């Protein structure tokens, strides 16, 4: 089932997500729904708060990045439950980011080029992954969602132009009206 997305000014996007304590059938269904939702909106990652669930879970639909920058997508997204970034490189790299919860806007964000992330999968097994480049960026972006942080919070002030802020306000108004706020 494709779930409704939470948008820019939704309070749930600013909350710290609760840890997942048990892997249930409901959690498995949430992951299936998130997978359909991510595919429908053509995302590369999706965090549970973006579909209204304030729990520490996200999915990533990219398996790897080829040398030419082309992305290889997974048949089924990788699941990260209670993820923790355990290592980050000191080298920061700027990259252009967007977010399904802030449709139509993109911005430059500096993030570490390499990370190691530890999490559980849907079978409850702990795993650790060393990632770099775009895959590392996806994991950091989605992990930020679990801490109530949006990519716009990580943009430099100079990149938040008046036009960017005006567009952000238009998004806020549009989706507040759609939600009946």
Curated annotation (Swiss-Prot):
Binds 1 Fe(2+) ion. InterPro entries: Peptide_deformylase (IPR023635), Peptide_deformylase_sf (IPR036821). GO terms for molecular function: metal ion binding; peptide deformylase activity. Its EC number is 3.5.1.88. Keywords: Hydrolase, Iron, Metal-binding, Protein biosynthesis. The active site is at residue 142. The keyword Metal-binding applies. Gene3D superfamilies: Peptide deformylase. CDD domains: Pep_deformylase (cd00487). Fe cation binds at residues 99, 141, 145. Its cofactor is Fe(2+). One of its GO terms (biological process) is translation. It catalyses: N-terminal N-formyl-L-methionyl-[peptide] + H2O = N-terminal L-methionyl-[peptide] + formate. Belongs to the polypeptide deformylase family. Removes the formyl group from the N-terminal Met of newly synthesized proteins. Requires at least a dipeptide for an efficient rate of reaction. N-terminal L-methionine is a prerequisite for activity but the enzyme has broad specificity at other positions. This is Peptide deformylase.
């Amino acid at each position: 089932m494709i779930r409704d997305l939470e948008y820019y000014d939704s309070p749930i996007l600013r909350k710290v997500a609760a840890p997942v304590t048990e892997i249930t059938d409901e959690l498995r269904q949430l992951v299936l729904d998130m997978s359909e939702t991510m595919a429908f909106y053509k995302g590369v990652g999706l965090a549970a708060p973006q579909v209204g669930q304030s729990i520490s879970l996200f999915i990533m639909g990219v398996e790897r990045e080829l040398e030419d920058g082309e992305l290889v997508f997974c048949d089924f997204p990788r699941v990260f439950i209670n993820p923790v970034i355990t290592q980050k490189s000191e080298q920061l790299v700027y990259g252009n980011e967007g977010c399904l919860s802030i449709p139509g806007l993109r911005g430059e964000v500096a993030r570490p080029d390499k990370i190691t992330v530890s999490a559980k999968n849907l079978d409850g097994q702990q795993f650790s992954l060393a990632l770099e480049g775009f895959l590392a960026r996806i994991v950091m972006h989605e992990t930020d969602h679990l801490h109530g942080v949006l990519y716009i919070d990580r943009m430099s002030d100079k990149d938040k132009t008046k036009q960017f802020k005006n567009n952000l306000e238009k998004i806020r108004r549009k989706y507040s009206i759609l939600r009946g706020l």
